[in-house]
């Protein structure tokens, strides 16, 4: 991934003129200074007030990014609802965003405000490598997540059995290795001592082939993969929803089957937030199942007692004795406690009823859990689609304008301030994922509240 620091340097050069070591004057991956030029800092391009304002805004962005992504990591590792193996991808993605905010953004801000590189040649190479690695890993993570979503939709049973935490962790390691393979070789193989500049600069290779290959390999190709995968996911989910609605789901007045907020269709029996919906009228809720069982058992015992009392009443009637309702009721209680054949029959029938009800509850609970899992999978797919869409929207302006610069150079170069805005919007993406999780996912929202307010209440108690 081409470093946004290069975009900053290009924008500074465009604004400062030919003496500012612009893109055409810089080489790749190093700190430059003119052989006979002064090493003193250049005249600042921002006023003191502008420097303070930009530092405050970017400082808030850094803190917000770190806090939000730390909350994501804590939520996934501590919340039972978020402990699914696939959420480890979000932990790794949040870690990359935290590293961007702590190891890249502060130096990009300093480079922008000072208009030259202050931190030396060694850290310039480290900074460029980390910048490219973290930003590339973000989009490779999203590609891996999209493939995970695709396999979980098309091979639900088989893939979910194979998707263990160990396999997910191995995939995450592979994602970081792929990102390193994409990021580091250009920084190492293309290093050369750059030409003279008015003051130290830190930037990547400026050759056309490198700009285009880095943009394609680090952004446009992964975006194409993600788009195709999610289009396939949508088609498969839509086809399954239509099939299920034709077989089982009731059709509304307008002929449309009920769907969830993500358009993928709701699993039957799954509530809005993935919890089991209340059962139909002829099926009692789980919380009253014990009371229902007791009522059925008492009814069975009463019926057995009445049958026995009726038999005894018939014999007594022959002797001139009748059996009223009280006797029948008494017989029911006696039958339920007596060791005779009738009592044994009543106890056996109550055991059979209890066994039947327990099997029915277990089956209903299993179906409920399966539908909850399906609903959560759909919500997770939708949230990740939003994450990918926001990522593309944030980074597309930078990569598009950067590619244009690589093709036609100054003829296609956008104004310097606009170019700076584009690459800082890309950095802002690192702070948006926690916001997306909070807005679109109730499990994350509940977990964030639990983490923040539980600790606050503990502080008040102490």
UniProtKB/Swiss-Prot annotation:
Kindly give the InterPro entries that the UniProt entry links to this protein.
ADR_fam (IPR002233), ADRA2C_rcpt (IPR000735), GPCR_Rhodpsn (IPR000276), GPCR_Rhodpsn_7TM (IPR017452)
Segments in the Cytoplasmic topological domain: 77-88, 148-168, 232-379, 442-462
Extracellular topological domain: 1-51, 115-124, 192-207, 408-420
Name a GO molecular-function annotation. Answer: protein heterodimerization activity
| Ranges annotated as biased composition (Basic residues) | 294-308
Q: Which UniProt keywords apply?
A: Cell membrane, Disulfide bond, G-protein coupled receptor, Glycoprotein, Membrane, Receptor, Transducer, Transmembrane, Transmembrane helix
What are its GO biological-process terms?
Answer: adrenergic receptor signaling pathway; cell-cell signaling; G protein-coupled receptor signaling pathway; negative regulation of epinephrine secretion; negative regulation of insulin secretion; negative regulation of norepinephrine secretion; platelet activation; positive regulation of MAPK cascade
Q: Where in the cell is it found?
A: Cell membrane
Looking at the UniProt record, the site noted as Implicated in catechol agonist binding and receptor activation sits at 214, 218
Glycan attachment sites: 19, 33
Q: List the disulfide bonds.
A: 124-202
Return the annotated site residues (Implicated in ligand binding).
131
For the region Disordered, what residue ranges are annotated? 246-347
Q: Where is the composition biased (Gly residues)?
A: 311-325
Primary localisation category: membrane
Please give the SUPFAM superfamilies that the UniProt record associates with this protein. Family A G protein-coupled receptor-like (SSF81321)
TM annotation in the entry: 52-76, 89-114, 125-147, 169-191, 208-231, 380-407, 421-441
PANTHER family with a match to the protein in the record: ADRENERGIC RECEPTOR-RELATED G-PROTEIN COUPLED RECEPTOR, ALPHA-2C ADRENERGIC RECEPTOR
* Record function comment: Alpha-2 adrenergic receptors mediate the catecholamine-induced inhibition of adenylate cyclase through the action of G proteins.
Name of this protein: Alpha-2C adrenergic receptor
